[in-house]
């Protein structure tokens, strides 16, 4: 079987073109959309990602300010910074970059982000709005998975989707988004017994657990679609996903590549959220 590569390049380009046009309209009105990137780590991979976000914002006409709190930042210090930026009308959007210091849990500080500026949908309020089916910003990676599947015309209504991973930033919100598309969703995790017995019955398998090569050809039925959300550092310094692509390719009908699949769409959606926040603030 020929496995179609579910790339995100075309979708990301279309999203970015629309975002750029809207950002330029805001700038023409006198005030550019502005994002605060809050960083509390010295992680090289995080630094690379933050730099890529800043470059993406610059290309699209979005002002982006990196605010470094240091790897020794406390929960109180992070919350104070988030509250200050939430109250500052100069900023339309806030993104708290992970990882956080070992002593700080995302759930303990994210509630300090104002919902109207929480463009990555990580606060308890944003996640609650999503669970209730109400308007709010959605975690961009979870949204990117759904948008990528739609872009490649993968049907979701009535289909069985197995989501491997239950984090608050991908797995859980993705399950909510898939339910809204009328999919039948099974969420698997580290305590799931016989993972392959579940995933091999699914029409779509989404791997979002952060373990390189966890999902293999044995986990996938012939003709299924596989979306790889993982970004793990390989021994050679490159990036690999949560899916063993070689064993899945030729068995799955479609497979998103790493890199080049979900990632570009996630960044594009984050930038679109920033502009949407700015548009709402401008009335």
Swiss-Prot record:
Coiled-coil segments: none
Pathway linked to the protein: One-carbon metabolism; tetrahydrofolate interconversion
InterPro entries tied to this protein: Aminoacid_DH-like_N_sf, NAD(P)-bd_dom_sf, THF_DH/CycHdrlase, THF_DH/CycHdrlase_cat_dom, THF_DH/CycHdrlase_NAD-bd_dom
Family: Belongs to the tetrahydrofolate dehydrogenase/cyclohydrolase family.
Function: Catalyzes the oxidation of 5,10-methylenetetrahydrofolate to 5,10-methenyltetrahydrofolate and then the hydrolysis of 5,10-methenyltetrahydrofolate to 10-formyltetrahydrofolate.
HAMAP family given in the database record: THF_DHG_CYH
Name of the protein: Bifunctional protein FolD
Gene that encodes it: folD
